[in-house]
């Protein structure tokens, strides 16, 4: 794989993924197909004026997904003490179209990638927390799409369950990578398997036709040397930076120390976004209820 400083454009990332899929270590990675309902949802949401009836039809085509939407709409974060919603239409009105699509995307992704390994026990819980935090932050920062931020937060580490399902010995690698202090998590993954969860996750994003900026951000979320580069794609830099903030906020909520990426690159991310510690503390307080609800 080429270095992060050579992947300053989205096109460079996409070309690297395509080469690795054709001739490199990604040839034998089994990527779950994108769920048909998610493909339909993506098509509906890509229209200049999305068809609300089509989104509702997709939602009601799966009983469990309908129940998930109703539960989200009736959660403290959205109900504000109001009467409980009882129909998908009511839930969509309360949540709004973008949040409705985000809840549906999370449900469908979770169904497509079953996680049974104990090493990944809280995978979807933490992915959902990250997505919630990122959309919250994006709404408070200029020029960042809350929809893209939520999608990136949800899929950021999706390479892990994919590798756990299709790469022999990967669960052992996860244990080793978490324990080692002499090299990073992705360095251990690459030493053992010639690829890592950031690359595999980016491939999932590409094959599932997520936004190119999301694909590039997933690919680069642990290769942070280019984070402060002016020539790097600003949308990708913004997503990766907000992702670092979200991870810091999550770990603080879980009473954990900041991770290594934050220790080294947190100040750069804050500088890129033009924020300070007071902003972080304010957002931490704002997110408590949302984190507890996940």
Where are each of the predicted segments found?
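Conserved alpha-helical "signature site"
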Residues: 1-173, 179, 183-258, 262
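C-terminal appended segment following the main domain
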Residues: 243-294
């Amino acid at each position: 794989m080429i270095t992060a400083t050579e992947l300053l454009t989205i096109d460079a990332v996409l070309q690297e993924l395509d080469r690795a899929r054709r001739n490199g270590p990604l040839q034998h990675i089994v990527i779950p197909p994108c769920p048909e309902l998610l493909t339909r949802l993506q098509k509906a949401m890509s229209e200049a004026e999305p068809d609300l009836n089509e989104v509702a039809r997709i939602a009601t085509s799966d009983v469990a997904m309908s129940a998930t939407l109703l539960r989200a709409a009736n959660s403290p974060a959205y109900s504000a003490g109001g009467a409980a919603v009882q129909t998908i239409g009511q839930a969509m009105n309360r949540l709004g179209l973008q949040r409705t699509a985000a809840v549906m995307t999370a449900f469908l992704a979770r169904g497509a990638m079953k996680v049974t390994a104990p090493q990944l026990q809280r995978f979807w819980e933490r992915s959902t927390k990250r997505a919630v935090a990122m959309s919250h932050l994006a709404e408070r920062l200029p020029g960042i799409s809350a929809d893209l931020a939520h999608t990136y937060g949800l899929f950021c580490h999706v390479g892990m369950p994919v590798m756990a399902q299709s790469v022999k010995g990967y669960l052992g690698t996860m244990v080793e990578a978490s324990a080692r202090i002499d090299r990073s998590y992705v360095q251990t993954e690459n030493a053992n398997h010639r690829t890592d969860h950031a690359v595999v996750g980016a491939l999932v994003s590409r094959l599932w036709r997520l936004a190119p900026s999301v694909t590039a951000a997933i690919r680069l979320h642990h290769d942070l040397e280019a984070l402060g580069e002016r020539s790097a794609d600003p949308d990708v830099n913004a997503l990766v930076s907000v992702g670092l903030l979200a991870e810091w906020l999550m770990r603080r909520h879980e009473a954990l120390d900041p991770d290594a990426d934050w220790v080294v690159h947190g100040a750069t991310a804050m500088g890129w976004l033009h924020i300070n510690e007071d902003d972080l503390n304010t957002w931490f307080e704002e997110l408590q209820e949302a984190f507890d609800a996940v």
